[in-house]
Regions:
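Bacterial N-terminal signal peptides that target proteins for export
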Residues: 1-10
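Bacterial N-terminal signal peptides
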Residues: 10-17
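Sec/Tat signal peptide C-region and signal peptidase I cleavage site
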Residues: 19-24
Length: 355
């Protein structure tokens, strides 16, 4: 898919008058991109890697972006600071990792009980979401773009079964973003741990449960070996990663390279979304055949209802923290109301009638 898309994009660039012959002797812009992910953490690491490849090919080598994985720069949760400070021209991470520094950036990854991936992409590109995200990052002098979606994530791996709200009290769990605040309200001790430390933290009992992503990435991390209960999701229905770009460096690029970079980011983001979907489909069947001891569970209805209540209360509180987050949450709520009616009529009804 990526090779075919690259050819189409290059052809489009030529039609637009970006002749590669004219590129030959132009200045080469060498950039660096820092990621939250390790060098083998597919498909997350694939999004920036493919983006850099596309940008280089479409620019005939004029935009050369080196991708540094977390095992090189050693600051997996410091991506915003490094891009903002100019150590890196670009970054690839998840916006909710720095909600403690700037609450306005929180909603752009995903929100509990929120939009699905198609709904959220429609909001970003046609419902005003992208403009709101740029508005949130403007104070950091950073541009932000969708960077690939994991789809609906699983609810996490637990050492013990959750049968009631009492089972959540005192539970130590790694879960980032707004979902962590929801669980904290219900008595969970919440922490955020970098990806490379997740397995050892669960193995040593530093945490009792963790949420990572979905079957393909979770199985590769080996969580099924130490926590047998695997819960369906509620908290991250459309986890969108983010490309971050230093605004000053972006403005220094010629206009054609700016357009090439934006296009490369958009294509790589979509490619990660469908790549991850494929990987999860393969991994799900593998769990059923190779790991029969994994127990697939759904949280009890009374627990889900308590989470929804806590989520609604927290949203009201967050909306009071800044005019911008109030605007973003209002935009998401209004778009979801409109989009969900079509989702129910199209996707849900189709599945209901044909499963």
């Amino acid at each position: 898919m990526l090779k075919t898309t690259t050819k189409l994009l290059v052809a489009s660039a030529l039609v637009a008058g970006l002749s590669t012959a004219a590129f030959a002797k132009d200045k080469v812009y060498k950039w660096k991109l820092a990621t939250t992910w390790g060098s083998t953490l597919s498909p997350f690491i694939d999004a920036p890697t493919n983006m850099a490849k596309l940008a280089k090919e479409m620019s005939n080598g004029r935009l050369d972006i080196r991708v540094d994985a977390a095992n090189k720069h050693k600051a997996p949760l410091g991506i915003l600071d490094m891009v903002k400070g100019g150590q890196y021209e670009m970054g690839h991470s998840a916006s909710y990792y720095w909600k403690g520094k700037d609450i306005n950036t929180l909603p752009f990854t995903t929100m509990p009980f929120g939009m699905t991936a198609p709904e959220q992409y429609a909001w970003f590109y046609y419902g005003g979401g992208l403009e709101l995200m740029q508005k949130a990052y403007k104070r950091h002098k950073v541009l932000s773009f969708p960077g690939g979606n994991s789809g609906n994530q699983m609810g996490g791996w637990f050492r013990k079964e959750i049968n009631s709200l009492d089972d959540l009290k005192g539970l130590k769990m790694r879960i980032p973003g707004f979902a962590g605040e929801v669980l904290a309200k219900l008595g969970v001790t919440v922490t955020n741990i970098a990806p490379g430390e997740l397995y050892t933290s669960l193995e040593r009992g530093t945490i009792d449960a963790l949420e990572w992503v979905s079957p393909s990435m979770d199985v590769n991390m080996g969580f099924h070996k130490i926590a047998p209960y695997y819960y369906t999701g509620w908290h991250e229905p459309a986890t969108e990663l983010q490309f971050l770009v230093n605004e000053r460096q972006f403005k220094r690029l010629p206009k054609d390279l700016q357009k090439i970079l934006i296009t490369a980011m958009r294509v790589a983001a979509y490619d990660m979304y469908i790549q991850n979907y494929h990987m999860n489909a393969v991994a799900w069947s593998k769990i059923a055949t190779d790991y029969p001891n994994v127990k697939i569970k759904t949280l009890p209805k009374n627990v889900i209802n308590a989470m929804k209540k806590a989520n609604d209360e927290l949203l009201v509180e967050k909306a009071k923290e800044s005019p911008l987050i109030k605007e973003v949450l209002k935009s998401q709520k209004e778009y979801l109301k409109k989009a969900r009616e079509w989702t129910k009529m199209a996707d849900y009804k189709y599945l209901e009638d044909n499963l």
